């Protein structure tokens, strides 16, 4: 990211919250490991929380910048390029560039390749635990490549870097009051969750993440910290376990 955020644009805070003063903000490019490699030295854990829900061409359809037919054809294409080089084959000092001719940021590039690149650097730096914010499932309105690239990242990280304790957090839809547009979407998703629950989860195949319980972003963050503090937590962490980890952290903080 670009360092300390502009708080009014990303949260309900008009000024920097108190906790942010304890954070050492760094400017780096996830696709250029040399820009953050030194920050990994001595780190106990690394968290990858970047990703895209909609690709640029899909947004273009919604904003009218691209024709619906052309945009949707590209958005739902079976395959797209990730980086211009496999992150596992990247040479020291080499940056990863978008593999699409128009420089598009694709699911393959952001959801998969950037995570693998970061995990590789973390492993080489001796980091003990790596956490990847994945997803519970896809959704009918999203291209299948959204969830496929998430699962590909999980698979590659777990198989290529077994020395690290790899944790894959799989939440459903994330919401927060600071992002007003997420609130009505969370309400709709919660309705889907209730409907799916009443059928014993039999609608999961149809609804995907739309049938999972939406979670507040802060709750997921607490679960991430708790998972990295517990050496027994590894592999995929589903919605129910995310809630359990967050509740455990809450109870401990109340003592």
Give the residues covered by each predicted segment:
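Short, polar loop motifs at secondary-structure junctions
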Residues: 1-5
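Eukaryotic N-terminal targeting leaders
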Residues: 7-14, 247-255
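NAD(P)H-binding glycine-rich loop region in Rossmannoid oxidoreductase-like domains
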Residues: 9-117, 121, 228
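SDR active-site strand-loop-helix element
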Residues: 49, 130-136, 169-171
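Short, flexible active-site loops
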Residues: 97-103, 129-142
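Conserved Class I SAM-dependent methyltransferase catalytic core
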Residues: 115-123, 127-135
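Oxidoreductase cofactor-interface core, primarily capturing Rossmann-like NAD(P)-dependent enzymes
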Residues: 125, 138-254
């Amino acid at each position: 990211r670009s360092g300390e955020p502009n708080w009014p644009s990303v949260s309900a805070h008009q000024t920097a919250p108190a906790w942010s003063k304890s954070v050492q903000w760094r400017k780096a490019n996830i696709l250029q490991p040399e820009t953050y490699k030194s920050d990994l030295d001595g780190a106990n854990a690394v968290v990858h929380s970047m990703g895209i829900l909609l690709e640029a061409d899909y947004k273009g359809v919604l904003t009218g910048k691209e024709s619906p037919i052309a945009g949707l054809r590209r958005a739902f294409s079976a395959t797209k390029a990730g980086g211009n080089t496999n992150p596992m084959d990247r040479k020291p000092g080499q940056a990863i560039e978008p593999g699409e001719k128009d420089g598009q940021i694709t699911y393959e590039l952001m959801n998969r390749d950037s995570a693998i690149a970061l995990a590789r650097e973390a492993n080489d730096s001796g980091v003990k635990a790596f956490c990847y914010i994945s997803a519970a499932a896809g959704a009918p309105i999203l291209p299948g490549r959204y969830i496929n690239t998430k699962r590909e990242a999980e698979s590659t990280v777990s198989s290529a870097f077994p020395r690290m304790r790899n944790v894959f957090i799989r939440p459903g839809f994330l919401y927060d009051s600071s992002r007003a547009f997420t609130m009505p979407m969370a309400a709709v998703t919660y309705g889907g969750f209730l409907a799916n629950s009443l059928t014993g989860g039999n609608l999961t195949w149809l609804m995907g993440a739309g049938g999972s319980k939406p979670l507040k972003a802060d709750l997921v963050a607490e679960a991430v910290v708790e998972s990295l503090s517990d050496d027994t937590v590894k592999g995929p962490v589903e919605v129910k376990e995310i809630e359990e980890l967050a509740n455990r952290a809450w109870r401990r903080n109340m003592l």
